[in-house]
Amino acid sequence: MDWQGQKLVEQLMQILLVISGVVAVVVGYTTESFRTMMLIYAGGVVLTTLVTVPNWPFYNLHPLKWLDPSEAEKHPKPEVVSVASKKKFSKK
């Protein structure tokens, strides 16, 4: 799953859960049934899971383009600069 696919999954998850929650509350309130409300919401959670958890092909529309090893060797890695540790002195 590419990074744009991850963004899409996050948006779909939020939208589907909110819609299923609102529908569940409205139907549960109108039918005066807590059980119906919970079943509708559970169905929404299952549907959201089936849509967002598997790595569906439409989540891979923008694959990452990695550098070839020969190209990566041309660009050196950044050097790590060690920073002297600073001790915090407490006031007494």
From Swiss-Prot:
<comment type="similarity">
    <text>Belongs to the SPCS1 family.</text>
</comment>
<comment type="function">
    <text>Component of the signal peptidase complex (SPC) which catalyzes the cleavage of N-terminal signal sequences from nascent proteins as they are translocated into the lumen of the endoplasmic reticulum. Dispensable for SPC enzymatic activity.</text>
</comment>
<keyword id="KW-1133">Transmembrane helix</keyword>
<dbReference type="GO" id="GO:0005787">
    <property type="term" value="C:signal peptidase complex"/>
</dbReference>
<keyword id="KW-0472">Membrane</keyword>
<feature type="topological domain" description="Cytoplasmic">
    <location>
        <begin position="60"/>
        <end position="92"/>
    </location>
</feature>
<feature type="region of interest" description="Disordered">
    <location>
        <begin position="73"/>
        <end position="92"/>
    </location>
</feature>
<dbReference type="GO" id="GO:0006465">
    <property type="term" value="P:signal peptide processing"/>
</dbReference>
<feature type="transmembrane region" description="Helical">
    <location>
        <begin position="13"/>
        <end position="30"/>
    </location>
</feature>
<feature type="topological domain" description="Cytoplasmic">
    <location>
        <begin position="1"/>
        <end position="12"/>
    </location>
</feature>
<comment type="subunit">
    <text>Component of the signal peptidase complex (SPC) composed of a catalytic subunit SEC11 and three accessory subunits SPCS1, SPCS2 and SPCS3. The complex induces a local thinning of the ER membrane which is used to measure the length of the signal peptide (SP) h-region of protein substrates. This ensures the selectivity of the complex towards h-regions shorter than 18-20 amino acids.</text>
</comment>
<keyword id="KW-0256">Endoplasmic reticulum</keyword>
<feature type="topological domain" description="Lumenal">
    <location>
        <begin position="31"/>
        <end position="36"/>
    </location>
</feature>
<protein>
    <recommendedName>
        <fullName>Signal peptidase complex subunit 1</fullName>
    </recommendedName>
</protein>
<feature type="transmembrane region" description="Helical">
    <location>
        <begin position="37"/>
        <end position="59"/>
    </location>
</feature>
<dbReference type="Pfam" id="PF06645">
    <property type="entry name" value="SPC12"/>
</dbReference>
<keyword id="KW-0812">Transmembrane</keyword>
<dbReference type="InterPro" id="IPR009542">
    <property type="entry name" value="Spc1/SPCS1"/>
</dbReference>
